[in-house]
């Protein structure tokens, strides 16, 4: 399990790995060929420290790996 609810992880050069920012990929904006935008849903409110326990369970807390603002690794100790 990676930090940020399983969506972000620290990859090479301490940049967040694949899946970063895709907490709810099925709720992303979709566009059609007619250039119309359809919003499929709204995500529920999140707890401020929701990912802290998950990172600790996975052992990433020992490496200092967590995702900060704009899904950047914070601190950069991966």
Curated annotation (Swiss-Prot):
Expressed in roots. Induction: By iron deficiency in roots. Keywords: Metal-binding, Metal-thiolate cluster. GO terms for molecular function: metal ion binding. Pfam families: Metallothio_2. Belongs to the metallothionein superfamily. Type 15 family. Metallothioneins have a high content of cysteine residues that bind various heavy metals. This is Metallothionein-like protein 4A. It comes from Oryza sativa subsp. japonica. The gene is MT4A.
């Amino acid at each position: 399990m990676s930090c940020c609810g399983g969506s972000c992880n620290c990859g090479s050069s301490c940049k967040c790995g694949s899946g970063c920012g895709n907490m709810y990929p099925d709720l992303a904006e979709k566009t059609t060929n007619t250039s119309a935008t359809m919003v499929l849903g709204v995500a529920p409110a999140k707890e401020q420290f929701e990912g802290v326990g998950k990172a600790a369970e996975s052992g990433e807390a020992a490496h200092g790996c967590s995702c900060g603002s704009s899904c950047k690794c914070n601190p950069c100790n991966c």
